[in-house]
Amino acid sequence: LGDVYKRQVTDRRDIYNEGIEHFQSGVTNGRLRRAIYYDYSPEYNFAQWQESGRDQGHTLMCVGLVGVICQLAWSQGDDFFAYDDNLFLRGCEYAACCNYTEETVPFTTYIWQKHNQWNGISPEEQTVVGGGKWMKRAIWALPYYHYKSIKNMSDEKLKYTKIATEYVGVEGGGGYYDPNSGGYDVLGFGTLM
């Protein structure tokens, strides 16, 4: 995100290209296909976030930050909303269904490096964690209005993202939703689209 944003401010295409290259093929979770860990399409219009087995606060942060990256790239002429046949939308649908309905979603166990500095977190995540459900975050209007208004997708394809957008309502901006850091992850400009 930093490289993509720095290009906007400094007008340095080389920095932007580095960020975009990492977003597509990097070796860390900054790569979209690593952040969105498992794709259930075409059976379901869902793609599981790597953080889904950890907690919903981190999952929602990922939705918000990836949305910002997609929008920054869109402003530069690169369409990451459509990347990998709308992978980001499937990730949004998955997270929104987990967080704003009582429906169940498929889950694929995520295993990560067991020897690291976060010894208190299970290295094998075997289920969607319900902690943090129903949190309001200023993240849903951006993907909903992009896919609805720019991509002309039907509400059927945006079912859960629409539910989340309606649940949050008009985005109040950073810090509006709660006093911890999650309320500041994304500033909430999506409603302005």
Residue ranges and their predicted role:
Residues D55-C62, L87:
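Secondary-structure capping and boundary motifs in well-ordered enzyme cores
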